[in-house]
Amino acid sequence: MSQSQNAIFTSPTGEENLMNSNHRDSESITDVCSNEDLPEVELVSLLEEQLPQYRLKVDTLFLYENQDWTQSPHQRQHASDALSPVLAEETFRYMILGTDRVEQMTKTYNDIDMVTHLLAERDRDLELAARIGQALLKRNHVLSEQNESLEEQLGQAFDQVNQLQHELCKKDELLRIVSIASEESETDSSCSTPLRFNESFSLSQGLLQLEMLQEKLKELEEENMALRSKACHIKTETVTYEEKEQQLVSDCVKELRETNAQMSRMTEELSGKSDELIRYQEELSSLLSQIVDLQHKLKEHVIEKEELKLHLQASKDAQRQLTMELHELQDRNMECLGMLHESQEEIKELRSRSGPTAHLYFSQSYGAFTGESLAAEIEGTMRKKLSLDEESSLFKQKAQQKRVFDTVRIANDTRGRSISFPALLPIPGSNRSSVIMTAKPFESGLQQTEDKSLLNQGSSSEEVAGSSQKMGQPGPSGDSDLATALHRLSLRRQNYLSEKQFFAEEWQRKIQVLADQKEGVSGCVTPTESLASLCTTQSEITDLSSASCLRGFMPEKLQIVKPLEGSQTLYHWQQLAQPNLGTILDPRPGVITKGFTQLPGDAIYHISDLEEDEEEGITFQVQQPLEVEEKLSTSKPVTGIFLPPITSAGGPVTVATANPGKCLSCTNSTFTFTTCRILHPSDITQVTPSSGFPSLSCGSSGSSSSNTAVNSPALSYRLSIGESITNRRDSTTTFSSTMSLAKLLQERGISAKVYHSPISENPLQPLPKSLAIPSTPPNSPSHSPCPSPLPFEPRVHLSENFLASRPAETFLQEMYGLRPSRNPPDVGQLKMNLVDRLKRLGIARVVKNPGAQENGRCQEAEIGPQKPDSAVYLNSGSSLLGGLRRNQSLPVIMGSFAAPVCTSSPKMGVLKED
């Protein structure tokens, strides 16, 4: 820094002394700041121990050590050699700007007054020196410019002097030539004789040459001026041309630059346009694809709309047709009520004629059983009672009557509680637990050891059902369906009319069979055998509260809700309702009495005390004559009135008798259950066989592993649709106990149409020896658990099991392509006789004689009513097994959309009665 100042301040104008004095002042200031031995600085340092040694931030950044102002004299001599005006100017500008930084630094360290004062003085000196140096720099710059201009003028003067010297040399040479020529001429003239004449002539001649030379000189000068002017003109033109060329070049460069910029801009615009075009193309392609999809969806929606229109129209037609069918069924209901009243009047007249001593009081609304069949049954029972020990039988009768009256008292209390709050019917397909009752078939020609082994197998499986249900225990949920069950029993009245002809034929056939028997029967028998001997191929099924279905036929004190099995129930009726036995030994038409002949083998029965709420049940084992067994094993396949032939995967199955729905001695057990819903009347009526067809296995989540899955015809289809509406129907189930029979059936969705199954078209094959006893569920006491359920053949028209009526089935036929399987009803056939009307309702059929039956079996297999086999299901909320018949011939009435769900089934125990 001092070098630049010395270089600038040393000038020939005499300003060096001033700058040296200023430099000394700045040195003094710097020395004060850099001297560490000053007392003021020591005082401040002692007062403030934490204050560090003073050092400017600017000095720290730019390595300022306070030595730039104190330079030695030997360095000042060579300062002007390495300094330039630009460096000096930038240095002074830095010093001027340094004052602002010092002020900022002063604000930071304002707690030291002495240092602040010294720094302010230093700043003022530095600013003054910087301003003086800046002024001197400006003056030096002006002087340097003047020096350059003078040097340029000096060069021009040197050029002019050289030019003048050149011209002077030329003129001297020309004068020398002229002088030489003149001297030669003078020498020539002096040699002539006339001297004076020659001298005058030479003088004149020289003057003439001088004039000529002067003229030539002038011409040369003029020519020189012209050439100079021309050269100047050419020079000016050249300059102008150069300027024009330079301007043209600059213009071209400018235009080229503008063109390049425009080209780059247009390139960018083109790239943007191309990107936009690509984006538009993508959007266009996406829009085109969306248009195609929307057109496709539009077509689908149009097709769906047309289908929905068709379905809506079909549903409207179905609704109208359902309304018409409803009115038609109401008319048929009124007609059935009229028939019922007529039949009741006839029954009343027959009772008044038959026996004045009979005191069984039936209700006018329900005349299901006649006095003839009941009296005949009691007659057979009493004949068997003659061979028993009188004292033991009376003791047992008293104990049984005591249990019955206790049961009546409990049932009356339960009924009073359940009338005001009727329970809702559990719907199959829901998750509620339900009790499934299946038939327990067995053949009569088995050996005694085989019977015992089967009983042991049944006893081993009894413990599973003991924890799930107490048999015979009354409850409000079971008694809530009493009115519905009583209305179902009214169908027995209609079925009874179709059984009269069959009883006469069966009487003759039974007598013929018993006449061929050779062996006698040893041992004691009980009244229970009166029913078991007539139904040798039947199976006993125990309902939780099957006796409660008889309430409508007895006085209040005789209404039994506990299950009373077989002839034991008739025994109680005999003791309580008919004390007068004057006409008990009279023969009754249509009733078979077993007391007049011996049976081929001992009949053993086991009964458990159901009235004491035990967990076990009743089991009967009856042997059949060998001749009848051989006939049955070689009989041809037939099709019953209500039972269709079924061909299982395990092998062919044979129906044992020509009319299994009407047999007494060799018939299949048929039990009736009804699933009631608030739907339109259904056209589905099914008969459940027990031994002629493969039985179903009932699975339970709470039972042992011996239970298998249910495999029922039309189950999968009914489960898929019936379960989907379970919740809705649970909330809409109602109960009515005061309406008429037809109205209640219509409310519950019950009708008596015959279900036609295409499977009956296949002929039946004989049953092999290994299948003497049909497969029964694992919980049946009469047979061991099945290794696997026998599969059923698929049904073609599965929708008939859940359709409410034919128009709804037609609606589903349009949707799923189902073929119709029923013909529309003929309204013109309403006014017929009683048998034709019953046949039209699908409840009973006219039974042919045995000879005609044997000839018409093939025709019945083709054109007869086709019924699918099924198991008997009883909901847990029901208090009775609706429709349990003595003759096991009433068809099963299935509710529409009834999707049964198997859970647990109580097992029937085996207890020997001492």
Swiss-Prot record:
Biased-composition ranges, Pro residues, are: 775-787
Write down which residues bear the modification named Phosphoserine. Answer: S420
Asked if the Swiss-Prot or TrEMBL record annotates the protein with the keyword Signal, the reply is: no
Where, by tissue, is this protein expressed?
A: Widely expressed, with highest expression in heart.
Q: HAP1 N-terminal domain location, by residue?
A: 48-353
- Grouped into one coarse class, the protein's main location is cytoplasm
Q: Where is the composition biased (Polar residues)?
A: 1-21, 454-471
- Superkingdom of origin: Eukaryota
**InterPro entries the record matches:** HAP1_N, Intracell_Traff-Reg, TRAK1/2_C
Which GO BP annotation is one of this protein's? protein targeting
Region Interaction with HGS, as annotated, extends over 359-509
Q: Which residues form a coiled coil?
A: 134-354
Q: How does it assemble?
A: Interacts with GABA-A receptor and O-GlcNAc transferase. Interacts with HGS. Interacts with RHOT1/Miro-1 and RHOT2/Miro-2.
Q: What is this protein called?
A: Trafficking kinesin-binding protein 2
Species this protein is from: Homo sapiens (Human)
In the UniProt record, the gene name given for this protein reads TRAK2
